[in-house]
């Protein structure tokens, strides 16, 4: 198992093509997998709903008010996460994805640690997220990192809402 210290997390600012290319691939994989798990499989990114395609093709605009974090092992983008700007003392974590070939190597933990630090530095007292109930490995990771299930703010069924202090 690779130690998570080998993972480097950077905040994506739209400044380099290599990071952007890696981010687009990660977001594409995230959305295609999520749609398939929801029973709404699509063959390629161009078949995704407009709002998801916009995140892939123009993340600078889609996440204009948010921090986009990208994890690297060497020169390879292996994970991503979006953390929203704090509102009412709370930030939300979205789009956490680790390339399946790099899972179990601390990538998600490194991204979440960077997200917690970013949220705290920007005035958040808590972070929250929602996760599909069938993603039991993700739910277990969040629980290990101190998240607890809370009342849902989501209207979509099968989403588990969780939060923790930063």
Regions found by a protein language model. Give the residues of each.
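Conserved G/P- and acidic residue-centered "switch" motifs that form tight phosphate/ATP-binding loops
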Residues: 106
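Acetyl-CoA-dependent GNAT
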Residues: 4-94, 99-100, 112-114, 118, ...
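C-terminal "cap" of GNAT-fold acetyltransferases
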Residues: 2-10, 125-166
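Glycine-rich ATP-binding loop(s) of histidine-kinase-like ATPases
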Residues: 103
């Amino acid at each position: 198992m690779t130690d998570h210290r080998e993972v480097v997390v950077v905040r994506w600012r739209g400044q380099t093509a290599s990071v952007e290319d890696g981010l687009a691939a990660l977001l594409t994989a995230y959305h295609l997998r999520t749609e398939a798990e929801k029973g709404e499989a699509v063959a390629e990114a161009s078949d995704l709903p407009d709002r998801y395609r916009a995140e892939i093709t123009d993340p600078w605009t889609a996440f204009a008010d948010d921090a986009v974090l990208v994890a690297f092992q060497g020169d390879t983008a292996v994970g991503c996460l979006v953390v929203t700007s704090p509102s009412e003392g709370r930030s939300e974590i979205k789009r956490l994805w680790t390339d399946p070939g790099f899972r179990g190597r601390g990538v998600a933990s490194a991204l979440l640690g960077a997200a917690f630090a970013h949220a705290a530095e920007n005035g958040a007292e808590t972070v929250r997220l929602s996760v599909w109930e069938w993603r039991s490995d993700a739910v277990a990771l969040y629980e290990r990192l101190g998240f607890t299930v809370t009342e849902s703010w989501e209207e979509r069924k099968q989403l588990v809402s969780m939060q923790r202090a930063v």
